């Protein structure tokens, strides 16, 4: 039997291929960044051909580093940045335009139009989602309205819509020569075009948004054999797992029981709680979404708090303000001061997501005095991540009725121990970092491995999970609530900036 499982992890800033063994340990990894394209304020694009090229490159590099071939892999899974929207020509394989990235806000006029006609939550009961620039359905509508020839091709079935999972799968399984046009339930649930209860494309939503059914992919489980990869160097390997990145991290953290939750700290931050086989409708500004579907089992659902900007704020301080040269330098800089000097940063670069859902909010730095230094800004940036996570945790506790016993964490920012301690302090709950922090890729590997019998069951996966470090809260309650009150005040200042 093949010794390993592979995972394609196609994220907002880079593409990676990671090879895992049966214990969930990394055998080999390769990574390559792609360009972020900003044609106008609020617009964010990726080049689909660059993403495809980089994905193929990192697959080859990771295999070469460990001296592996396709025959060493039992299966491959895909995890991807969600909501990022593509439309490509079925006959040529060429994209009709650049991909509209999840944080792109060009659909704000469409959102306002639909909100005026029936309120921000008019489709929430069916889709689990509020009207927002975040979701893929209206991004597709924008492409159909604004890219020459797109609408006619989509209606004729000559243009194919997909999120990044669909784009990669179609290309890897043959492309113009019979590639499989599929998406899994988790990615489909981020389009605003499916009925959560049935996990099927919904005619009412398609009609409301003006989306032709002919361009849509087939919806499949998150763990199932979709076909064989037909491109080198993975030719002949089964493609057998597919999950949006945050759902993949939930699986990678083995949150298989209702009430289990994880928070991923990446470009944005995403807190997901497994709610079992029934969707829980949020009254506190969270999203109701698919968690995963393993083979023929019933789909599992989750509540999600999506935060647009956390790690991206650190990048902004590095790239735009030049406060430091590389991201890890933010921690010693922030540690050089005792507190934030009463400075608060609300990073509403793309509006505010959960639990506020304010597309008209924009970034604010509040509380500045002559006392404030670059170190205070660095500290305020890290703290803003923790405050945003608390906003979401409070909403999640309100919706679920379950108090968070501990927060399982993953993602790039968990290496920042100042942030992890402050997170525990501001939540007044333990924060737990697992030994394996690459849980997004691991979740995709788990989904693929389960589909082909590489792992027998969920207990095999649970046995792989272990704690690296736990941070206990140590901040006095009075201090914690004083800080949080100031944060809430700063958040209010960010609202209603865009007319």
UniProtKB/Swiss-Prot annotation:
* Matching Pfam families: FGGY_C, FGGY_N
Q: In which pathway does it act?
A: Polyol metabolism; glycerol degradation via glycerol kinase pathway; sn-glycerol 3-phosphate from glycerol: step 1/1
Enzyme Commission no: 2.7.1.30
Protein residues bound to glycerol: 82-83, 134, 245-246
Control of this protein's activity is summarized as: Inhibited by fructose 1,6-bisphosphate (FBP).
| Record-level Gene Ontology MF annotations | ATP binding; glycerol kinase activity
Q: Quote the CDD domains the UniProt record gives.
A: ASKHA_NBD_FGGY_GK
Q: A single GO CC term, please?
A: cytosol
Q: Which UniProt keywords apply?
A: ATP-binding, Glycerol metabolism, Kinase, Nucleotide-binding, Transferase
> At the top level of its lineage, which domain of life is listed?
Bacteria
In the UniProt record, does the keyword ATP-binding occur?
yes
List ligand-binding residues for ADP.
12, 16, 267, 311, 412, 416
- Residues at which ATP binds: 12-14, 267, 311, 315, 412
Single biological process term from Gene Ontology? glycerol metabolic process
List the InterPro entries hit by this protein, alphabetically: ATPase_NBD (IPR043129), Carb_kinase_FGGY (IPR000577), Carb_kinase_FGGY_CS (IPR018483), FGGY_C (IPR018485), FGGY_N (IPR018484), Glycerol_kin (IPR005999)
Keyword Nucleotide-binding present in the record's keywords: the answer is: yes
Which residues make up the binding site for sn-glycerol 3-phosphate?
12, 82-83, 134, 245
Q: What does this protein do?
A: Key enzyme in the regulation of glycerol uptake and metabolism. Catalyzes the phosphorylation of glycerol to yield sn-glycerol 3-phosphate.
HAMAP family hit by this protein: Glycerol_kin (MF_00186)
Q: Which family does it belong to?
A: Belongs to the FGGY kinase family.
What PANTHER family has UniProt attached to this entry? GLYCEROL KINASE, SUGAR KINASE
Please report the name of this protein according to its UniProt entry.
Glycerol kinase
Per the UniProt entry, what species is this protein from, by scientific name?
A: Acidiphilium cryptum (strain JF-5)
Gene it is expressed from: glpK
């Amino acid at each position: 039997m093949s010794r390993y499982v592979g995972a394609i992890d196609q994220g907002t800033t880079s593409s990676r291929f990671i090879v895992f063994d049966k214990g969930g340990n990394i055998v080999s990894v390769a990574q390559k960044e792609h360009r972020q394209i900003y044609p106008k304020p609020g617009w964010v694009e990726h080049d689909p051909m660059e993403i495809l090229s980089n994905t193929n490159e990192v697959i080859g590099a990771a295999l070469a580093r460990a001296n592996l071939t396709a025959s060493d892999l039992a299966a491959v899974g895909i995890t991807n940045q969600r909501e990022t929207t593509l439309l490509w020509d079925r006959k040529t394989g060429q994209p009709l335009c650049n991909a509209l990235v999840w944080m792109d806000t060009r659909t704000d006029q469409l959102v306002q139009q639909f909100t005026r006609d029936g309120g921000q939550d008019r489709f929430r009961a069916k889709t689990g989602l509020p009207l927002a620039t975040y979701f893929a359905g209206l991004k597709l509508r924008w492409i159909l309205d604004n890219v020459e020839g797109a609408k006619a091709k989509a209606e004729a079935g000559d243009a194919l819509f997909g999120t990044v999972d669909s784009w990669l799968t179609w290309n890897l399984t043959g492309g113009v020569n019979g590639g499989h046009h599929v998406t899994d339930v988790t990615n489909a649930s981020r389009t605003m075009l499916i009925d959560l209860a049935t996990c099927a494309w919904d005619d009412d939503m398609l009609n409301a948004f003006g989306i032709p059914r002919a361009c849509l992919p087939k919806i499949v489980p998150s763990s199932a054999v979709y076909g064989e990869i037909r491109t080198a160097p993975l030719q002949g390997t089964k493609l057998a797992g597919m999950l949006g990145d945050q759902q993949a991290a939930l699986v990678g953290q083995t949150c298989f029981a209702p009430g289990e939750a994880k928070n991923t700290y990446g470009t944005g931050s995403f807190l997901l709680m497994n709610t079992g086989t029934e969707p829980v409708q949020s009254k506190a500004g969270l999203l109701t979404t698919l968690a995963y579907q393993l083979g023929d089992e019933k789909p599992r659902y989750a509540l999600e708090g999506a935060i647009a900007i956390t790690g991206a704020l650190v990048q902004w301080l590095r790239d735009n303000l030049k406060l430091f040269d590389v991201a890890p330098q933010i921690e010693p800089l922030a540690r050089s001061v005792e507190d934030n000097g009463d400075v608060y940063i609300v990073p509403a670069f793309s509006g505010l997501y959960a639990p506020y859902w304010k597309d008209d909010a924009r970034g604010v730095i509040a509380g500045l005095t002559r006392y404030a230094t670059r170190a205070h800004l660095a500290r305020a940036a890290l703290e803003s991540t923790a405050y945003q996570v608390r906003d979401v945790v409070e909403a999640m506790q309100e919706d679920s009725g379950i108090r968070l016993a501990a927060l399982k964490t993953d993602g790039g920012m968990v290496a920042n121990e100042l942030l992890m301690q402050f997170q525990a302090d501001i939540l007044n709950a333990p924060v737990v970092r697992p030994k394996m922090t690459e849980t997004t890729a691991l979740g995709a590997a788990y989904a693929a491995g389960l589909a082909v019998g590489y792992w027998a069951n969920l207990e095999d996966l649970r046995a792989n999970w272990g704690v690296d470090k736990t941070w206990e809260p140590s901040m006095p309650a009075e201090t914690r609530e004083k800080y949080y009150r100031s944060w809430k005040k700063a958040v209010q200042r960010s609202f209603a900036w865009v007319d």
